[in-house]
Amino acid sequence: MEDLLDLGGERRRGSTTSGPRMGRRAQQESAQVENHLSGKNSSILTGEVAPPPKPPRRQGGWADDSMKTSKSGRRASEEVEEGSHRLRQQSFGGSDDGGDIPVIPDLEDVQEEDFALQVAAPPSIQVNRVMTYRDLDNDLMKYAAFQTLDGEIDLKLLTKVLAPEHEVREDDVNWDWDRLYTEVSSELLSEWDLLQSEKEDPMGQPAHT
């Protein structure tokens, strides 16, 4: 009952307040108030109660962290893009200024130049000098130590029988193939004739008197 009395009082107040107003706005406001009051009265009479409003959704824990990380990731990506854009502008500006770009030579060219400038050093090989006959004769004449071998073998008998150099040494002569062939063939024929004659006369008598 009290609710009905309150509703009646509200209607009266609404009528008193809306009475002096004229125009479209006043009519719209009065219509809204009446609809609101009629809906309220119908809900009270039927016994239905309007559901309570839903509380606002609260986010916390992992949701907040994910939001923060997403925001921080966006900021980091934006900063990286800005830095790359600045570097590109600086590189373009440096190229426009006409700066000298260093030229790096190829490795093959460098190696070829080094090999061309290098000079091969002569090989250092120790060669034992071969003694000539003259050196041997001089050593035998001057040094008595060479007359004995290992301090035990006496070489005096051998040195006495040695022929002089001019008898043993031969002159260097260029050989002619035809001449050499004729000399060798004549020597062989002479030896063959001598053998044939010895076979015919086994007593050793000369074949020609």
UniProtKB/Swiss-Prot annotation:
Keyword match Cytoplasm: yes
Parts forming coiled coils: none
Positions of modified residues (Phosphoserine): S77
Residues modified as N-acetylmethionine: M1
Biased composition (Polar residues): 28-45
UniProt GO cellular component terms: cilium; cytoplasm; cytoskeleton; intraciliary transport particle A
Family indicated by similarity: Belongs to the IFT43 family.
Protein name per Swiss-Prot or TrEMBL: Intraflagellar transport protein 43 homolog
